[in-house]
Each structure stands twice: as C-alpha cells, then as structure tokens.
C-alpha cells in the first residue's frame, strides 16, 4: 500500500464514523471490511457486516451526533505486509481537550479490505 492508498483508506475509515446517513455508513462498512471481518477490543469482539454497522452506529450516535466529538489522526500512520497502524484522537468538534486517544491495528486481506481490526483506547486524562 503506497502513501496515497493509505491516506485514502484512513480518510474513508474516519469518514465512516462521522457519516450521519445510515445507508451510506453501511456502504462504507461494506467497502472497507471483508464480509466476515472482525472488530476487536478488550470490551467487544464482533464479526460481520451487521455487527460492525451496529457498532459504528452506536459510536456515531453517542460520540459524534450525541456529544459533538470528531475523530482525527493523531500521529504517524504506517503500513507494511498487510498491516496498518493508525493513531487517532477524539476531540470536541468546536475545539477543546482530547477526550480519548486510540491505536487501531488493521489486518488487511489481499484486496485491501479489513480482515481484523484491533482497537486500543486510552481515556482522557483531563
């Protein structure tokens, strides 16, 4: 994956969390993930489009639409051998201190879609 492809992947991924339209959000999930892809963290282990769509909807409704936060890159994004490392932060859309910092590790299939996503989230220290 070259830098332009990596930037496009991350842009679509972040856009998915911000997307208010449920049909468009589902389309982004299906574009980004394998049909049996998984999203894992210490709090959940979900698999498949329906579960991932529900997870993204919950996060969007709570953090983006509900509390006015946005997600954005927070550090260097890197990729090799089908693995992507992406640091992100959640901040108020109108400015203010960071609410959360995360590291997402993506394992991609040969077609570039997500096979597995491992999420690590650090809560705010504010």
Where are these regions (language model features)?
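Short acidic-aromatic low-complexity motifs
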Residues: 1-32
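Short, mixed-charge, low-aromatic patches
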Residues: 6-16, 41-42, 59-63, 115
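Hydrophobic pocket/interface hotspot
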Residues: 13, 29, 37, 52, ...
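Short histidine/acidic/glycine/proline-rich micro-motifs that form metal-
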Residues: 15-19, 43-46, 92
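A solvent-exposed, acidic/Ser-Thr-rich amphipathic alpha-helical stretch
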Residues: 26-82
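A beta-strand edge to alpha-helix "cap/lid" segment located at domain peripheries
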Residues: 57-126
